[in-house]
Amino acid sequence: MMTRLTLFILLIVGAGCAAQTAAPPDDTPAARGKVAFEQRCVPCHGAQGRGDGYPFLKPPPADLTAFAVRNKTDADLLITIRHGHPDTAMGSWRFTLTEKEIWDVLAYVRTLQK
């Protein structure tokens, strides 16, 4: 009987320890940016960022995985996110996203390019 009680107590204590050591939620800029990207950018840029969202846009949305976008500086991409891109459907996000969210989206876009 004592062995069963000891085993039971060890299981309860072990379960409590396991719950405390669970990994915290991913709160990196790229993880936060992914959430914003999924909410705001996927309709046009597509789930993988390849510009395959709305097929009827002319010109089509940028393929964020393309070599041309990979070679742009962070400053260039931040300007595009903040202010949009002339003569395209890419509008300004500066009044919708906070500055932190814009940087987070940029961090996520950079992960699409690897």
Residue ranges and their predicted role:
Residues C17-A36:
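Electrostatic cytochrome c docking/interface patches
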Residues M1-L5:
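Positively charged n-region of N-terminal signal peptides that target proteins for export
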Residues G53-P55:
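Short, surface-exposed glycine/acidic/tryptophan-bearing loops
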Residues G33-A47, V105-V109:
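The canonical Cys-X-X-Cys-His
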Residues K58-T111:
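Extracytoplasmic electron-transfer domains, predominantly the class I c-type cytochrome c fold
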Residues A18-A19, C44-R50, R82-H83, R110:
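Detector for the c-type heme attachment site
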